[in-house]
Structure formats: C-alpha cells, structure tokens
Amino acid sequence: MASSSITSPTSAAPVYSDTVVRGFALMAVVYGIVGMLVGVIIAAQLTWPELNLGISWLTYGRLRPLHTNAVIFAFGGCALFATSYHVVQRTCQVRLFAGPLAAFTFWGWVLVIAAAVVSLPMGYTQAKEYAELEWPIDILITLVWVAYAIVFFGTIGIRKVRHIYVANWFYGAFILA
C-alpha cells in the first residue's frame, strides 16, 4: 500500500529552468577541453617552437592568453553559472527569476568567449595579465555579469523558503566580488 507522503508524478513539484543550466554545463565541458588542449599545444611549443608553423596567431605569445582566458573565464565561468543557477533554484524552490534574462546570460557569455577566441590570437589585447580582452568585450562582460546578478539575486528574492542556504551566500559573494 502506497504512503500518502510520497509525491506522485502529477503533484505540484516545482519545475526548474534547466535549459540554461544544461547549456552552461555543456559549454563548460567543451571550453575545458579546448582550453586545456591549447595549453598542451603551447607546452609543446616550449620544446618545439616550430609547431607554430610560422603563423603569427599560432605563436606562444598569442596562444597563452587564449589558454588562460579559456580555462579561467570560459571553463570556470560556465561552471560557475551552471552550478549557481542549479543550486539557487533548488535551494529556493523556485524557477530562475526573469527566464529570458537568464537565457541572455548564456548567449551573452558565449558571445564573450567567441570574441575572445577571435581577438586574442589576432593580438588585440590590453596587455594586462588576465585582463587582456579589449574594452568592447569588457562592456559585454559587464552587461552579462549585471544580468547574472539580477537573475541570481532575483531568484533569492522570490524564494519559497524562509532561510538562505550558505551555498547561495558564497555564490552571491563571488558574483559581487
């Protein structure tokens, strides 16, 4: 005999916004593989400099910023977006606040990474370690990050539980810092 406390498939369980979460998770894997592959290529160039084939955008100096930005911002950024969006929905027991804005954060971040992939090997940088991207890309990063903060903190604002889980405090601090 079934217990009445078991939730049936037709009960009013919250339906979460997982499309954006899956997109960020998939891209984190893709960017992780690509970023680390570029790292292997530039490591090999330290031993065999001729691996750049005489093409300027394949030189160590052009590929190293691409590698660091791909691993830090593409892989790490997508992993942060995916995990924070997943966790905030489940700990607050609500869908993401402003669903279309959450989709903008995904496509905006993909555009940021695409712009970095094009501009860094071409040598368009600000020549600042870990802040190489040109100012138009910086503006897009800012727009995406502000949208991210709105979605994340908006989701916390409409939560159905009284307390805020500690994981959300850490994600919130990371977003603000």
Positions of the model-derived regions?
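Hydrophobic, small-residue-rich membrane helices and short re-entrant helix-turn-helix hairpins
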Residues: 16-19, 160-166
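Hydrophobic cores of alpha-helical transmembrane segments in multi-pass integral membrane proteins
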Residues: 2-3, 22-124, 135-157, 167-177
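Short, intrinsically disordered terminal tails adjacent to the first/last structured region
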Residues: 1-10
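Extended, aromatic/histidine-rich regions of cofactor-dependent oxidoreductases associated
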Residues: 127-131
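Cytosolic juxtamembrane amphipathic/interface segments immediately preceding
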Residues: 9-23
